[in-house]
């Protein structure tokens, strides 16, 4: 099986206010407070889709900030019909949808495979977060697919690309 990865970019000059916010945000040790403050910030500070490069037929990842404590934030610009692999995350993951529509299929680990448990649709202004086991990368196993061209902000407690990949 060939696994195609998204294209990753570092930062964006028009998003300095986001980096300043994130630098302060990541000094907070409580993931739930991080989620609350991020929702509040993003409702007050519009982030346009056009600020981030597309990468058809998948999605692009623009790293907005990486902190010394390993927290990172990135923007994902999804092409319509883009689908991620089934993957896990570090201890904490937070997604906030700014534009478009995303379908998130949730899975549970079963050996080296994943078993689907739920599917949810997210629209602009909606978010979800996951809190799992520290020092593992198989938390919050899911697959994301874009029903429309979309833009989402993601915050992780470590490098999301370390997430374990699963098959069904």
Where are these regions (language model features)?
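Short acidic-glycine-tyrosine-enriched beta hairpin
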Residues: 106-142
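N-terminal leader/capping segments at the start of a protein or of a new domain
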Residues: 1-47
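Glycine- and acidic-residue-biased ligand/ion/polar-headgroup-sensing regions
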Residues: 90-109
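A short hydrophobic beta-strand segment most commonly corresponding to one strand
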Residues: 94-96, 142-163
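A short glycine-rich, His/Asp/Glu-containing loop-to-beta-strand
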Residues: 50-80
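Short glycine/proline-enriched turns and hinge-like loops at secondary-structure junctions
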Residues: 87-90, 146
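Conserved short histidine dyad/triad with adjacent acidic residue
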Residues: 74-88, 122, 133-135
